[in-house]
UniProtKB/Swiss-Prot annotation:
Residues 150-206 are annotated as: Dimerization. The keyword Lyase does not apply. This is Non-structural protein 3. Homodimer. Interacts (via the coiled-coil region) with host ZC3H7B (via LD motif). Interacts with host EIF4G1. GO terms for biological process: regulation of translation.
Length: 313
């Protein structure tokens, strides 16, 4: 005999359809919010969360188990259905269900969803009207049952609350604000005046310093011009002195070797740098004095050999 599992297949189909609906709801919400997403990533994340919730809460196994019981009853096996009926009517099962309901209520209370909110959400639902800002409030079956049991009251009383109006003296408030504004204005003006005076003093000092710098620059330029002129004059004087000595040497009756030696020493004088030229002149004068001293000693020795005497006049 062919086994019938249509109820289990239907339950499995409902679960799969619920998962697809969850994926569509998630992607459409992201599109409405303008958030770009990867469909495969959203699909994977929703599937992982959906499978975890369905398995961890036991909802999936509960639905498939009840569907299997119905299929067994349809196949003529009523033992499982009888056991489920006995289990559902057992006092321990009822106590367990009450315990689960109480846990859920306490969980909702811990999340800030109090009894009033739970009752109102259970008694009413809101139906939006397309194209309009208004909506329709619908009563649920629980609300209808409460009306039938007389558990709904209409409070027509209107409590008129007297609105307390504080009397404010706007004139005194304005005067206080005006005084504060004038005081603030005066402080700002004083600070601004002090800043202007400091700025003027800084500008005066800066202009004075600029004048001093300009005068010093002018004096430095004059001194530089004088130094350059003095250096040129010294160079010309040294060059003229060298030429004069050279001309005077050539007019003397000296041997050619002596003239050549003195000429080489004159040519070695640095006419560009006056300091070096003075050192060269010093060396030349020392050499001349040394030659004169040697000549005098030779002349003195010669006169002694000839038995002559000499005197300075």
């Amino acid at each position: 005999m062919l086994k019938m599992e249509s109820t289990q297949q239907m339950a499995s189909s409902i679960i799969n359809t619920s998962f697809e609906a969850a994926v569509v709801a998630a992607t459409s919400t992201l599109e409405l919010m303008g958030i770009q997403y990867d469909y495969n990533e959203v699909y994977t994340r929703v599937k992982s969360k959906f499978d975890y919730v369905m398995d961890d809460s036991g909802v999936k196994n509960n639905l498939l188990g009840k569907a299997a019981t119905i299929d067994q009853a349809l196949n003529g096996k009523f033992g499982s259905a009888v056991r489920n009926r006995n289990w559902m009517t057992d006092t321990r099962t009822t106590a367990r269900l009450d315990e689960d309901v109480n846990k859920l209520r306490m969980m909702l209370s811990s999340k800030g969803i109090d009894q009033k909110m739970r009752v109102l959400n259970a008694c009413f639902s809101v139906k939006r009207i397309p194209g309009k800002s208004s909506s329709i409030i619908k009563c649920t079956r629980l609300m209808r049952d409460k009306i039938e049991r007389g558990e709904v009251e209409v409070d027509d009383s209107f409590v008129e609350e007297k609105m307390e109006v504080d009397t404010i003296d706007w004139k005194s408030r304005y005067e206080q604000l005006e005084k504060r504004f004038e005081s603030l204005k005066q402080r700002v003006n004083e600070k601004y005046t002090s800043w202007v005076q400091k700025a003027k003093k800084v500008n005066e000092n800066m202009y004075s310093l600029q004048n001093v710098i300009s005068q010093q620059q002018s004096q430095i330029a004059d001194l530089q011009h004088y130094c350059n002129k003095l250096e040129v004059d010294l160079q010309n004087k040294i060059s003229s002195l060298v030429s004069s000595i050279e001309w005077y040497m050539k007019s003397m009756e000296l041997p050619d070797e002596v003239k050549t030696d003195i000429e080489q020493q004159l040519n070695s004088i640095d006419v560009i740098n006056p300091i070096n030229a003075i050192d060269d002149f010093e060396s030349l004068i020392r050499n001349v004095i040394l030659d004169y001293d040697r000549t005098f000693l030779m002349f003195k020795g010669l006169m002694r050999q000839c038995n002559y005497e000499y005197t300075y006049e």
